[in-house]
């Protein structure tokens, strides 16, 4: 059950389509929607963040934040679901931490992909924070995609607590009787009922009356790209994966599936931890 949804953005104009999509999802679920609009201080150039910050008195930045909040409230006026719009303003380097300290409680957090953000650095930091510290599942939503109905999903499977969490969170988003393809990259084990196999996951999903498929892909270097390409080729509505099964530092230095999915999101992606 999704009773409360959380959405975060940093620009009303860039995120307009994202907000309309999330409001429609909240209406369909009869869910409450909490929206955080982040207003960073001025930068010499967005791509320089977190460097290149320019000084602006707090009262001026607050006025800018209030102006943007007024635009967002106007855009969502008349919505049939309760919407709680909140604002945070600060230096771009601190906003993700401010968001974490605010600790909004929601059943599902949703964030637009990098195309819907004015500052790429802020998108990455907020997305990582939500995946690691929100205490619930996170969906990254690229432009032109919807969360209204999930009838076909891909579950990226690698034996881990994070992947099991993704399995449980995914079930809560699926339509009754939906199809789930369990997808792993690497050599298929000889026995499917072993710890690396798909049988236990398939049994769980079938018990919940979902249609289940099992796929093993030959692993290539960029697993995040490989998973998304496969999901798009089979027409999946959503890709679900465990988030940061390795440490965030290791992912930042060496790369990883979570970092890849955050960096380039081609279909709705559910991240769970």
Task: Describe the role of every protein-language-model region.
Residues 22, 72, 99, 201, ...:
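Aromatic/hydrophobic pocket-lining residues that form π-stacking "cages" and hydrophobic walls in ligand
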Residues 1-55, 133, 149-216, 236:
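Small/aliphatic-rich secondary-structure junction motif
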Residues 36-38, 86-90, 141, 183-185, ...:
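Conserved beta-strand termini and adjacent loop/short-helix elements that scaffold enzyme active sites
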Residues 19-21, 97-146, 232-273:
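Gly/Ser-rich helix-loop-strand patches that form or flank binding pockets
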Residues 43, 93-95, 118, 148, ...:
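Generic structural signal for helix capping and beta-alpha/helix-loop junctions
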Residues 15, 65, 92, 119-120, ...:
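A conditional alpha-helix N-cap/helix-loop micro-motif detector
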Residues 74-109, 207-239, 245-249, 267:
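Structural beta-alpha unit
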Residues 54-67:
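A short acidic, glycine-rich active-site loop
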């Amino acid at each position: 059950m999704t009773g409360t949804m959380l959405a975060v953005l940093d620009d009303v104009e860039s995120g307009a389509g994202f907000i309309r999509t999330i409001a429609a999802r909240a209406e369909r679920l009869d869910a409450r929607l909490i929206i955080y609009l982040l207003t960073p201080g001025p930068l010499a150039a967005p791509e320089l963040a977190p460097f290149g910050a320019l000084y602006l008195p707090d009262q001026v930045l607050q006025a800018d934040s209030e102006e943007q909040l007024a635009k967002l409230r106007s855009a969502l006026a008349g919505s049939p679901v309760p919407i709680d719009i909140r604002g945070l303003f600060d230096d771009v380097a601190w906003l993700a931490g401010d968001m974490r300290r605010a600790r909004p409680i929601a059943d599902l957090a949703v964030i637009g992909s990098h195309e819907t953000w004015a500052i790429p650095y802020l998108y990455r930091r907020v997305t990582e924070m939500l995946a690691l510290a929100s205490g619930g599942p996170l969906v990254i939503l690229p432009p032109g995609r919807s969360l209204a109905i999930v009838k076909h999903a891909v579950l990226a499977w690698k034996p881990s607590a994070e992947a099991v969490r993704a399995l449980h969170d995914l079930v809560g988003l699926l339509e009754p009787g939906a199809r789930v393809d369990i997808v792993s990259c690497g050599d298929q084990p000889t026995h499917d009922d072993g710890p690396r196999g798909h049988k236990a996951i398939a049994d769980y999903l079938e018990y919940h009356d979902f249609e289940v498929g099992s796929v093993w892909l030959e692993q290539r270097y960029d697993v995040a790209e490989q998973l998304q390409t496969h999901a798009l080729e089979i027409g999946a509505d959503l890709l679900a994966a465990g988030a940061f099964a390795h440490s965030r530092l290791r992912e930042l230095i060496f790369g990883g599936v979570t970092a890849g999915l955050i960096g380039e999101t081609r279909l709705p992606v559910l991240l769970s931890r």
